C-alpha cells in the first residue's frame, strides 16, 4: 500500500511557477481525499491507483508561503515556498558541471549573495529499487549558500541569477542531467519505437542483453564499477604528472578504459535508462520551460540527431501537457581532443541543433562557438553560456524584443561572378572581427564539392562575399565546418556568427 506523501520534488524552499495552473501530486491510499492549500487557494482530489494530483489556480509571484497537504489523518507542511519562475535544466556533463568546479566558482560561492535562486537536484540513479526510493525521500529544494550551491549546475545558476535579477522574482531550477548521456537515455521506449532510425538506440541495448540472465549482467556491471573506481584514481595520478598526456599514454599507465561499461540494466548509459528514474520523477511539476545542453555523446550518430532531438522535445512537451513548452538549448562549442583527427561529427550536431531551432516552435539556441577549449570537452567558463541562454529566454519567452539574443545566422547565398555572397539574419548592427588574422574559417567549393580555403570580405550592404582563386564558379560555402578552429567573426553584441554550410545535402 502506497504511503501518503507528496512527490519528492515538493519540499520546503520550493519554487512554484507563477501565472500558470500548478499541479501538485503524490501517492496515497485508494479512495482517501487529499486537500492541498496555499496562500488562500485550495484544491481537493481523491486517490486512485495509489496516486493523486490536484491543480491549483494560477498565482502571482510572491512568498514566502506555507503549503499544507492533508488526507484528514496526516498533514504535510512545506515552508518558505516561493512563487516565481521554474526551469528544468536538462542535458549531460556540461549542464551538470558544478558551480564549485567552474571558472571562478569558488569566488562565486564565497561572495555571491543570491537570495532569489533555488535548486532541486533530481536523484541520479536508474535502478528503482528500495534504496532508490529511500534516497529520493532525502532530496529537496535548497536555497543558495556556499555549501548547498557547490553541486548546483553552473550553467543553470548563471542563467537563473540573471533571470531573477531581471524579472524581480525567485527562480527555481530543477536539475535533471547526467554526464555522458545521449538524448535517447531521457526518452521512453514508445517514443523511440515510432521511427526506424530511432529504434536503433533501443536495438543497441536489446541486442546487448538478449539471452543473458539478470544475475549475470548485474555481476558484470558491479565488477566494472570496481574496475572503473581504480582506473579513475590512476588517471588522476597520471594527469597530475602528465598534464599534456595523450589518451593512449593515459591508457598505457592506467590500463584500458572500459568506460562507459557493459550495457546492462544497472548501467545508466543506455536508451530509456533515465526516463522513468529521473524525467518522470519530476514530471509533471509545473515549469516555465527547459534549458538544455547536450549532444556530445550523440556524435556517434550525428546524422540522426535532428530526428532524435526533435522527438525528445515533443515527448517532454507531451509529458508536461504543454505543446508550447519553451525549450532553450545550447549549440555545441568548438572541441577536439589533441590526438583525434577532425572527424567533423560535431559540425553535424551543431547543424542539427540550428535546424531544430529553425523548424521547431518555441525553441531558442544559444550559440557558444567561442566558448570551447582545445583538448577539453568540459569548458570551465560557464558564465557566457548561462548569459546567452538568458538572452534567448528573454527574447523568445519573456517577449523582450529589444534584447539582442543572437549573433548573425546564415540566411541565404547568391552568386555574383566568382564570388558567393552570403546574407544573414540578426546582422543589422554589423560584424566585429577579432584577432590579427582577419576573417578565417570560410571555405568555398564548385559543383565538384571540393572545398578550398576562402577569403571573406564584409560588403557595404551587410552581406559577406566569399571567394577563392581555385574556385571560379562557386556553388557551396561553409563556415567553421570543423570540430575545432579559431572563431574570428562576431556580431556587434559579442555573439559569434553561427557555423553553417549552404547545402545540407553536401556530405563531404
Question: Where are these predicted regions, by residue range?
Answer:
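Cell-envelope and extracellular/periplasmic
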Residues: 1-508
Amino acid at each position: 500500500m502506497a504511503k501518503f506523501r507528496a512527490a519528492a520534488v515538493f519540499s520546503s524552499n520550493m519554487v512554484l511557477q507563477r501565472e500558470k495552473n500548478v499541479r501538485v501530486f503524490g501517492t496515497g491510499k485508494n479512495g482517501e481525499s487529499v486537500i492541498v492549500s496555499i496562500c488562500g487557494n485550495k484544491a481537493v482530489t481523491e486517490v486512485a491507483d495509489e496516486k493523486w494530483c490536484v491543480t491549483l489556480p494560477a498565482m502571482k509571484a510572491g512568498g514566502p508561503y506555507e503549503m499544507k497537504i492533508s488526507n484528514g489523518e496526516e498533514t504535510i507542511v512545506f515552508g518558505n515556498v516561493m512563487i516565481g519562475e521554474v526551469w528544468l535544466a536538462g542535458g549531460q556533463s556540461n549542464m551538470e558541471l558544478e558551480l564549485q568546479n567552474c571558472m571562478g566558482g569558488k569566488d562565486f560561492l564565497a561572495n555571491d549573495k543570491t537570495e532569489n535562486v533555488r535548486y532541486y537536484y533530481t536523484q541520479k540513479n536508474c535502478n528503482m529499487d528500495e534504496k532508490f526510493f529511500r534516497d529520493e525521500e532525502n532530496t529537496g529544494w535548497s536555497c543558495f549558500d556556499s555549501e548547498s550551491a557547490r553541486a548546483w549546475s553552473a550553467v543553470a545558476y548563471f542563467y537563473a541569477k540573471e533571470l531573477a535579477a531581471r524579472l524581480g522574482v525567485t527562480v527555481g531550477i530543477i536539475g535533471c542531467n547526467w554526464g555522458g548521456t545521449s538524448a535517447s537515455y531521457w526518452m521512453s521506449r514508445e517514443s523511440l519505437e515510432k521511427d526506424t532510425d530511432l529504434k536503433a538506440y533501443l536495438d543497441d541495448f536489446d541486442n546487448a542483453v538478449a539471452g543473458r540472465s539478470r544475475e549475470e549482467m548485474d555481476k558484470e556491471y558491479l565488477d566494472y564499477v570496481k574496475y572503473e573506481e581504480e582506473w579513475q584514481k590512476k588517471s588522476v595520478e597520471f594527469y597530475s604528472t602528465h598534464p599534456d598526456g595523450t589518451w593512449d599514454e593515459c591508457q598505457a599507465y592506467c590500463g584500458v578504459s572500459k568506460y562507459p561499461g557493459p550495457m546492462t540494466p544497472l548501467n545508466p548509459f543506455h536508451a530509456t535508462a533515465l526516463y522513468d528514474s529521473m524525467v518522470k520523477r519530476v514530471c509533471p511539476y509545473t515549469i516555465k520551460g527547459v534549458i538544455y545542453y547536450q549532444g556530445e555523446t550523440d556524435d556517434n550518430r550525428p546524422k540522426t540527431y535532428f530526428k532524435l532531438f526533435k522527438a525528445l522535445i515533443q515527448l517532454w512537451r507531451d509529458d508536461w501537457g504543454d505543446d508550447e513548452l519553451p525549450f532553450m538549448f545550447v549549440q555545441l562549442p568548438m572541441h577536439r581532443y589533441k590526438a583525434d583527427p577532425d572527424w567533423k561529427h560535431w559540425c553535424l550536431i551543431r547543424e542539427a541543433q540550428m535546424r531544430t531551432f529553425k523548424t521547431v516552435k518555441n525553441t531558442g539556441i544559444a550559440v557558444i562557438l567561442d566558448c570551447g577549449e582545445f583538448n577539453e570537452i568540459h569548458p570551465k567558463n560557464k558564465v557566457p553560456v548561462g548569459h546567452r541562454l538568458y538572452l534567448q529566454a528573454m527574447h523568445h519567452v519573456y517577449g523582450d524584443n529589444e534584447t539582442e539574443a543572437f549573433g548573425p545566422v546564415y540566411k541565404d547565398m547568391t552568386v555574383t561572378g566568382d564570388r558567393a555572397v552570403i546574407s544573414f539574419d540578426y546582422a543589422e548592427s554589423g560584424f566585429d572581427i577579432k584577432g590579427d588574422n582577419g576573417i578565417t574559417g570560410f571555405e568555398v567549393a564548385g559543383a565538384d564539392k571540393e572545398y578550398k580555403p576562402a577569403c571573406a570580405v564584409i560588403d557595404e550592404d551587410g552581406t559577406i562575399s566569399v571567394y577563392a582563386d581555385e574556385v571560379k564558379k562557386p556553388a557551396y560555402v561553409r563556415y567553421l565546418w570543423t570540430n575545432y578552429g579559431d572563431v574570428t567573426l562576431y556580431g556587434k553584441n559579442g555573439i559569434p556568427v553561427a557555423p553553417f554550410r549552404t547545402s545540407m545535402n553536401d556530405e563531404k
